[in-house]
Amino acid sequence: MDGDTLSGFHYELIEAFARDHSLQVAITPEMSFNERLEGLANGRFDVIAYGILATSELKDSLLLTSPIVLNRQVLVQRKTDSPDDSLFIKSQLDLAGKTLNVVEGSPSILRIRNLGNEIGDTIYIKEVEKYGSEQLIALVAHGDIDYAVCEESIARAAADSLPQIDINTAISFTQFYSWGVSKQSPVLLDSLNTWLERFKKGKEYRKIYKRYY
């Protein structure tokens, strides 16, 4: 969301898909990832047009399209002028004992848990139900929370208007992200994959991609 206007990489992509198939698309902004999965399962949604990282947990819940974009999860925190600021995270090891805010049901939760195992210490996770990534970033910027984890592309877009945030600490490696459809919709999956294979080779996709990445 940009103010009261829907926008973004995935929005422009699903609009292009609908246009090319002479379909009317109804967009429902849903912050909670769990609610997205539930909406897909009960038929309220046809597609989760949002970057979904393929994990073994999710593969039991939905069908994933062919990869759409490369992205990674990053830590969002406030910049500091003090080298001794104990709140400022300089490396993943500094995350020990810290609490990271994420969108409820976010696939990044599994990665954060694994990261805790890698550094040999506990990283606490707070799932936020009513806010999306953009809102969590704003809460960090304004000092309401100290840390959030979200996709790098979203964080970079936000950093343009929130210069006080630091997004340089990676939480995950760069990985492919896909869209999701119901396990009962293999025909829709095939249609999306066929279209994506063709569309990603064209100028329009490159133009949209450059706008957000």
What are these language model-derived features?
Residues 69-77, 82, 129, 133-134, ...:
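Periplasmic-binding protein-like
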Residues 34, 38-41, 50-61, 111-118, ...:
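A ligand-binding cleft/hinge motif common to bilobed small-molecule-binding domains
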Residues 17, 40-41, 75, 95, ...:
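Hydrophobic residues within well-ordered alpha-helices
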Residues 2-6, 97-105:
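Short beta-strand->loop
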Residues 105-124, 128, 163, 167-168, ...:
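Ligand-binding clefts/hinges and TM-proximal coupling segments of bilobed small-molecule sensing domains
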Residues 1-60, 125-129:
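Extracytoplasmic small-molecule ligand-binding "clamshell" domains
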Residues 79-100:
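Flexible hinge/capping segments at coil-to-helix
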